[in-house]
């Protein structure tokens, strides 16, 4: 599997202490081009990010390192977990 590391988001922080990755969250974006979708996910003022963006052809863009907490799940709750961003890849 080849990852494209050309773009990096500044929208991340550290995972909360004790949180391990338990979930993979898949999102869909209606933004038409890869470039515009990536720009949306890395632009600081948008305050949103994802670990990866996978385009229609299967290219994988790595935007946030896996050991960091991307901002993709917002204020969320699942099975007693109140910080999905800290316990997921999204």
What are these regions (language model features)?
Residues 2-17, 22-90:
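Active-site-adjacent loop/helix surface patches within enzyme catalytic domains
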């Amino acid at each position: 599997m080849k990852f494209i590391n050309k773009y990096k988001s500044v929208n991340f922080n550290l995972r909360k202490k004790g949180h391990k990755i338990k979930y993979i969250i898949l999102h869909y974006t209606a933004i038409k081009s890869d470039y515009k979708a990536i720009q949306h996910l890395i632009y600081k003022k948008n305050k949103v990010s994802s670990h990866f963006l996978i385009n229609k052809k299967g290219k994988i863009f790595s935007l946030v390192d896996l050991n960091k907490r991307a901002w993709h799940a917002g204020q969320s709750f699942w099975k007693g977990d109140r910080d999905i961003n800290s316990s997921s890849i999204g």
